[in-house]
Regions:
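Conserved beta-loop-alpha segment that forms the PLP phosphate-binding cup at the N-terminus of a helix
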Residues: 67-99, 103-108
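A glycine-/small-polar-enriched, mobile loop at the entrance of the PLP active site in fold-type I
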Residues: 16-73, 77
Length: 300
């Protein structure tokens, strides 16, 4: 094929835009600059130090001291599927607190794994009521996992997690939380709320391009994975293998997205430079101002 015959876009250079949709958000210029750094091997000793730094930065943002923190190669859905496929075996019972689009995706994924899925559905646009979970847990003695969405992208609802977590722990199940939309913009207190597996994505409140799913894994969740009867159905999303790469031993699993990880490191630095509480306040203040402006226009 000659150069003249190569298909070209009618818009070869997309102009800069201010992104105001549900995601991705605009990437910080410092993040984009960091991603332009020269390439380095994913097993280079200096890159291992970068992984350790990213893990430490994630501990601060996830508000955890004991959890293993890492970033999966893929968007937030990879974090979702990694958690479900690693923590559930066929016929395990999982309760999914469903009040929006992405909890419906959880139901689909868990069903494909072969789990016994209990889909507790409540009204979209409203927080999930803890009493529904309490009633269902009273009817099932062998629930292995309970899942919830912290900030549901499809409706904008921020879900209180303390009551859901307590009910889950009182029934000796693991608690998995989707923080794709909230991490870096709202408080995500993994240790305080006893979350066993929490995952997010880089393209929203962390100010990075899409492509990584930061996650925090509790010792209890890690032990559940290590003592499985069968290997997870997904090799690529097996959290035990990914943890071996991000952990102390740094055992090769797959080719890590070096540039994305460099960008995430810079994005996390920016988050912590601003300060978590300051950042949370800014997001809440701006969200309230936007809502007030829309209501003033007669929108709801």
């Amino acid at each position: 094929m000659t150069r003249e015959n190569i298909p070209t876009s009618n818009v070869p250079n997309v102009p800069p835009r201010i992104l105001m949709g549900p995601g991705p958000s605009d990437a910080h210029p410092r993040v984009l600059q960091a991603m332009m750094s020269h390439m380095i091997g994913y097993l280079d000793k200096d890159f291992m130090l970068i992984l350790d730094e990213v893990s430490a930065l994630l501990k601060n943002v996830f508000m955890t001291k004991t959890n293993l923190t890492l970033a999966l190669s893929g968007t937030g859905s990879s974090g979702m599927e990694a958690g479900l496929s690693s923590l559930l075996e066929p016929d395990d019972t999982v309760i999914i607190c469903a009040n929006g689009f992405f909890s419906e995706r959880m139901i689909d994924m868990a069903t494909r794994i072969g789990a016994n899925v209990i889909a507790l559905k409540s009204e979209w646009g409203e927080p999930f009521p803890p009493e529904l979970l309490q009633q269902e847990l009273a009817n099932h003695s062998k629930v292995k996992l309970v899942t919830a969405i912290h900030a549901e992208t499809s409706t904008g609802i921020l879900q209180p997690l303390e009551d859901l977590s307590k009910l889950t722990k009182d029934n000796e199940a693991l608690f998995m939380v989707d923080a794709v939309t909230s991490l870096g913009g709202q408080r995500v207190a993994v240790d305080e709320w006893n979350i066993d597996y929490c995952y997010s994505a880089t393209q929203k409140c962390l100010g990075c391009p899409p492509g990584l799913s930061p996650a925090a894994l509790s010792p209890q969740a890690h032990e559940r994975i290590k003592t499985r009867t069968h290997k997870p159905v997904s090799w690529y999303l097996d959290l035990s293998l990914i943890a071996n790469y991000w952990g102390f031993e740094h055992v090769y699993h797959h080719t890590a997205p070096v540039s994305m990880i460099l960008g995430l490191r810079e994005g996390l630095r920016i988050v912590l430079e601003e300060g978590l509480e300051t950042r949370f306040h800014r997001h809440s203040k701006n969200a309230s101002a936007l809502a007030a402006g829309l209501e003033a226009l007669g929108l709801s």
